[in-house]
């Protein structure tokens, strides 16, 4: 005959196994985050504001590097963080599933962010050239490309604003 203590321990073990299997069964298998946008105007305005903060900080750091106030290595660290933040915004725009009336504005904003990210990559190349004591011709070619990419980003940003419903 079974003792009370043995029956209680058996019941506790069965409850623990049942609870653990239930918890495991309830755990989500798809851990990807998705962006659900209900107000596309506020969403794109938020993206624009974050972009302005990131670009202002990065541009300021770039000027400080050019002026010799910070080292190229310090700038590269800052630029890589800025690039990562811009990439996050690009992903956010892509995953937002903009409606037909907002798609043009979102696509132009996306191109603006991509151009700015290319701009950041070119500034990193310039920082590496400064570290390596490259020739003036190489640096001036990169500076021209940097300005073109920055201007392209601004133009796409204006197109994004003008194409909003």
Language-model regions, residue ranges each:
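C-terminal amphipathic alpha-helix
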Residues: 33-80, 112-165
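Short, solvent-exposed, charged loop/turn and helix-capping segments
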Residues: 85-111, 162-165
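Juxtamembrane loop-transmembrane helix junctions in multi-pass integral membrane proteins
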Residues: 3, 36, 98-101
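Short, low-complexity patches enriched in S/T/P/G
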Residues: 1-8
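Hydrophobic membrane-insertion alpha-helices, especially the h-region
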Residues: 8-24
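Alpha-helical interaction segments
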Residues: 14-15, 92, 106, 145-146
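Hydrophobic single-pass membrane-insertion segments
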Residues: 22-34
């Amino acid at each position: 005959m079974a003792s009370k203590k043995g029956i209680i321990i058996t019941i506790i073990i069965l409850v623990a196994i049942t609870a653990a299997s239930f918890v495991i069964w309830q755990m989500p298998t798809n851990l990807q985050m998705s962006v659900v946008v209900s107000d596309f105007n506020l969403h794109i305005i938020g993206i624009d504001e974050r972009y302005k903060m990131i670009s202002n900080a990065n541009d300021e750091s770039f000027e400080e590097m050019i002026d010799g106030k910070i080292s190229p290595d310090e700038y590269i660290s800052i630029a890589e963080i800025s690039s990562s933040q811009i990439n996050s915004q690009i992903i956010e725009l892509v995953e937002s599933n903009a409606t037909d009336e907002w798609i043009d504005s979102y696509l132009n904003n996306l191109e603006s962010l991509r151009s700015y990210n290319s701009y950041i990559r070119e500034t990193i190349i310039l920082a590496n050239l400064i570290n390596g004591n490259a020739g003036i011709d190489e640096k001036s070619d990169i500076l021209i490309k940097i300005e073109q990419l920055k201007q392209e980003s601004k133009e796409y940003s204006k197109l994004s604003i003008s194409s909003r419903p």
